[in-house]
From Swiss-Prot:
Entry keyword set: DNA-binding, Repressor, Transcription, Transcription regulation
Residue ranges occupied by any HTH tetR-type domain in the UniProt entry: 17-77
InterPro entries, per the entry: DNA-bd_HTH_TetR-type_CS, Homeodomain-like_sf, HTH-type_TetR-like_transc_reg, HTH_TetR
Name of the protein this chain belongs to: HTH-type transcriptional repressor Rv3405c
Pfam families: TetR_N (PF00440)
Protein species of origin: Mycobacterium tuberculosis (strain ATCC 25618 / H37Rv)
Amino acid sequence: MTTRPATDRRKMPTGREEVAAAILQAATDLFAERGPAATSIRDIAARSKVNHGLVFRHFGTKDQLVGAVLDHLGTKLTRLLHSEAPADIIERALDRHGRVLARALLDGYPVGQLQQRFPNVAELLDAVRPRYDSDLGARLAVAHALALQFGWRLFAPMLRSATGIDELTGDELRLSVNDAVARILEPH
């Protein structure tokens, strides 16, 4: 039997909070890299340096873990948006959340059912509702604005090439997308 060096043992998470945090981090990284379907519970356990039984103990099924990762990313993004975090940190968090969402959706996971909380969407709805005569109008406006943002985040390289706007800088494109989102969120 081989024993692990002491340095490896020190890096292993201990205690409920550390173990849960390590599992969430590992699952988030792996889901962003390759998607939930291509990631096994054993992969997550190995990356987080815990026994795979602990993944089940802390999070239940893989579907529940996907939901926990999405909730974790939403909460983390909300905290960043309310902090003094630099724009590049927020941008990386948005990108990571978008990647996990896209991969989970493409893998066939029912993201809208697995994720329990949508704090950023709730805040946006609260801000937009007073501008609309109906709740449905506000909800549709927010859905359209999010779809536009997700579309650009995921398909920007293809959209730039297909429409001949490769020469726009990232900042110019971001301003244009933000202007379009603002128009969507304002009733006509």
